Amino acid sequence: MSLRVAVQMDPILGINIDTDTSFLMMMEAQSRGHKLWFYTPDKLSQEDGRVFARAQPVEVFADKGAHARLGETVMLDMKDDIDVVLMRQDPPFDMAYITATHFLEKVHPHTLVVNNPAEVRNAPEKLFVTDFPGVQPPTLITSDHEAIYDFRARHGDIVLKPLYGGGGSGVARLLADDPNLDALLELHAMIGREQVIAQKFVPAVSKGDKRVLLVDGEPVGAINRVPASGQVRSNLRVGGRAEAVELTARDLELCKIIAPELKRRGLLFVGIDVIGEYLTEINVTSPTGAQQLKRFTGVNAAEVLWNRIEDIRANGG
């Protein structure tokens, strides 16, 4: 079965092919004989109820600096010309991102969009996890500064995060007596009107933040992301270091708790973040870590994903 695949992502010529999960997905698709097109989210349009993308056919190669060969730009009808869309642009989860999910919702599931765009919109990673009581550390989501002060008084050391964002940007640890809380809250208020997250600090983060990848609710494998010395952010984009790790009984328990909801929502490719015994995020936008997982364990999450996509398309989905 040869599929027509459009990949909505950040500029392809600027990616790091050693770490980029979207690139691994594209390489796997190409190896199976699927035809690839690339476009950035700003090239997506809607006119009279139909959705189009100004896209370029692309071939990908494991060759740094020459990893993508782009063809002439064409206008794709996303319902008639494409079988699968990989929605892989990185956050911020802003109104442009949300609008793109509305566009792609109009063609899904006739054109299979991975992940289901309506559910990507409905499941921001730091909010979606709150649907599963008892899996998180104590967590407050608010724009009420007094509530945040009260939360810190009850829990001591906390971590402050923007509600919408990614890659560890804007994350800060505050000690129980840290005088900088006011300044940080003022900074968040200046940047935007969104609520922030205050979360009880989990000391186990010094040993790493585990990223578990799931395909259609089933765990494929995990990597451990260890923060740089003196840091609490373990994200690879801000200096975290990846290392091999085994899935624990608790990891599998957490996966089992969320799996039915992932399947129901059509969230085929998901990355969850686990610190110690706690689930802290469910990433459904553009999960990373597949390259490192393959390097450490030989497990290719992109292969597992494409097996599932092909099965869905073969059965009329």
UniProtKB/Swiss-Prot annotation:
Keywords: ATP-binding, Glutathione biosynthesis, Ligase, Magnesium, Manganese, Metal-binding, Nucleotide-binding. SUPFAM superfamilies: Glutathione synthetase ATP-binding domain-like, PreATP-grasp domain. It catalyses: gamma-L-glutamyl-L-cysteine + glycine + ATP = glutathione + ADP + phosphate + H(+). Mg(2+) binds at E281, N283. Pathway: Sulfur metabolism; glutathione biosynthesis; glutathione from L-cysteine and L-glutamate: step 2/2. One of its GO terms (cellular component) is cytoplasm. It holds the Pfam family GSH-S_ATP. It comes from the Bacteria. The keyword Magnesium applies. Residues 126-310 form the ATP-grasp domain. InterPro entries: ATP-grasp, ATP_grasp_subdomain_1, Glut_synth_pro, GSHS_ATP-bd, GSHS_N, PreATP-grasp_dom_sf. Binds 1 Mg(2+) or Mn(2+) ion per subunit. PANTHER family: GLUTATHIONE SYNTHETASE, RIBOSOMAL PROTEIN S6 MODIFICATION PROTEIN. This is Glutathione synthetase. It comes from Caulobacter vibrioides (strain ATCC 19089 / CIP 103742 / CB 15). The lineage of its organism: Bacteria, Pseudomonadati, Pseudomonadota, Alphaproteobacteria, Caulobacterales. The gene is gshB.
